[in-house]
Amino acid sequence: LSAAYANGAYIDGAALYPPRWDATSKAFREALGDQAEQGVSYGPSPRQAYDFFPMDQTAKGTLIFVHGGYWRMFDRDSWSFLAKGALARGWAVAMPSYDLCPQVGIATITQQIARALQDIAGRTEGPISLTGHSAGGHLVARMLAPGMLPAAVMDRLQHVVPISPLSDLEPLCWTDMNDDFQLD
């Protein structure tokens, strides 16, 4: 079962993608200069921070993208380039990072994302569109669970779009990765 969840093993040249994402994102951030607010803290650890890409004028709303990486890898720096399209269409963009497994479990990461969303919502106005990929897709879907977010934030959620999320975590309990995930 562990081999079935090893995504990278089934993608030709998988190891080439992350350096490309990092380089493209770095160039994007550098091109924005002072417009990008990098490393805005929302919690006590260094990874509990987000990058915020505001609009020069009033934004149509805020797009929040939560990265994937099996809750064990990557951070906001790898995905900055994804903000380009939303910015071009008049949306501010925020991209949080979170502590990774095995230092913390998935339940803790879920709470961290809820805190990040509350912090971002507190500094923005208008609708919020929430999206994430893979593990990030799981995390954004969890934000719709009762009690995860205050009503004032929930009322602003216009769209929640999990992209290729890990939706059923039970099979992960029987993988080698669960030593990191701490699912019971």
Language model: regions and residue ranges:
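Alpha/beta-hydrolase superfamily serine-hydrolase fold, recognizing
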Residues: 1-184
